[in-house]
Each structure stands twice: as structure tokens, then as C-alpha cells.
């Protein structure tokens, strides 16, 4: 068990999310991602984890983990195909990773959803 896991084990899921949100707001993106990874590993099948999944994807992007952001954005879109923010994050993460053909396909998906990238 990692330090973060042991620290979070006694907290309620919402407390873990709130703490991750504070870390994100403080630009501690890697730590926020670690807390959210723990939260989703423990409670990912619970209803209402969409905000945590989105914050996780958002945490990966500025922490220079574009492919993890891509994977998270795709997971969000599997659950919620109309999530405009996830489409934008997918496009930008693919661009950042140098995956121009995939980014172009994601841009077409964004246009189909009426999302301006």
C-alpha cells in the first residue's frame, strides 16, 4: 500500500474527491491524479463518479501524461458520448502526443457534436 493509499483508506469517497480537487486547484496535478486513481480503483463502479473521471483526465493533461489523458477521455466518452469537455480533452491530448491523424478524427467527432475545438 502506497503512502497516498494508506492516507486515503479511512476517508469517505467524497472527501477523497474534494482533496483531489484542492490538489488540482493548487496545481499539484500528479498528486491529484494519484488520489483520483485510488478513488476510482476503490469506488469506480459507484454511480456519480463522472466528475472524478473528468478531473482525473484533466490532471493527466498538465502533468505531461497525454496518453493517460487520452485513455481517460475515451473512457468518459464510452460512458457519456455527449461529454463536450471530454471530446475537447481528447483532441488536445492527441495533438500534444503527436497523434495528428487520431486528433483529426477526434476533431471531426467534436464538430459532429457541435463542440468547437
Which residues fall in each region the model found?
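Short coil turns that delineate tetratricopeptide repeat
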Residues: 44-47, 81, 115
Amino acid at each position: 500500500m502506497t503512502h497516498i493509499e494508506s492516507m486515503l483508506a479511512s476517508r469517505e469517497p467524497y472527501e477523497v474527491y474534494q482533496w483531489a480537487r484542492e490538489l488540482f486547484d493548487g496545481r499539484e496535478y500528479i498528486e491529484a491524479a494519484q488520489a483520483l486513481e485510488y478513488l476510482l480503483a476503490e469506488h469506480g463502479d459507484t454511480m456519480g463518479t463522472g466528475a472524478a473521471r473528468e478531473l482525473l483526465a484533466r490532471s493527466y493533461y498538465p502533468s505531461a501524461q497525454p496518453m493517460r489523458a487520452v485513455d481517460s477521455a475515451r473512457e468518459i466518452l464510452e460512458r457519456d458520448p455527449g461529454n463536450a469537455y471530454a471530446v475537447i480533452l481528447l483532441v488536445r491530448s492527441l495533438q500534444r502526443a503527436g497523434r495528428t491523424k487520431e486528433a483529426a478524427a477526434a476533431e471531426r467527432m467534436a464538430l459532429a457534436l457541435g463542440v468547437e475545438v
